[in-house]
Every structure is written in structure tokens, then in C-alpha cells.
Amino acid sequence: MISTVALFWALCVVCIVNMARYFSSLRALLVVLRGCDPLLYQYVDGGGFFTSHGQPNKQMRLVWYIYAQRYRDHHDDEFIRRCERVRGQFILTSALCGLVLISMVALLIWH
């Protein structure tokens, strides 16, 4: 029989791997954004996005831009495709993080 603790740690590893994929896709999206729409790149603080002095309110602009699917009217097909990929990975990663939290609470109650 599979240990519930081992199953929990496997779920944590899957969540961390998906977070890494999400951040990698977000970084690739910013590279495409710099080339196709410099004004939007500057609006979301693309140059300082992954730095310690990045501006969270500008980072949230990009998150809400993607979450609300406002990219669908953009002129660049590559940018649209990357945004759809990032949006899907964000939803998957959010669901996995929620599942990790729920399973952690269940594991604490159960053991």
C-alpha cells in the first residue's frame, strides 16, 4: 500500500515542477513581448519582472491581462499562443497548490 506521506511529497514535487514550468513560460512570454509590443512590455515592467526591485502592482497587471484574456485582440500570433500557454499553466499550478494545501490539512487531521 502506498504511504499517504509519500503521496503528499510526490504531489509537492509535481507542484514545484509545474511552478518552474510556469515561471519559465512567463520568462519566454516576456522575451516575445519585448519584441512585439515594447509599450506593453514597459507597462508591465518586463525588464524588472524577475528582480528583487520589481514592482508587484505592474506584475499584477500582466497577470490580470492574461487572466482576463485581453491578449486575444493582440496582433502577434506568437504572443497570443504564449499567453494561452501561460494562462493554462497558471490555472494548473493554482489548482495544484490548492490541492497541496487541502492534502496538507487532511494529512495533519488524519495523522
Curated annotation (Swiss-Prot):
Membrane topology: Multi-pass membrane protein
Transmembrane stretches, start-end: 1-21, 90-110
Entry keyword annotation includes Ribosomal protein: no
Xref: InterPro entries: Universal_stress_protein_B
UniProt keyword list: Cell inner membrane, Cell membrane, Membrane, Transmembrane, Transmembrane helix
Database matches in Pfam families: UspB (PF10625)
Subcellular location: Cell inner membrane
The protein's name: Universal stress protein B
Source species of the chain: Citrobacter koseri (strain ATCC BAA-895 / CDC 4225-83 / SGSC4696)
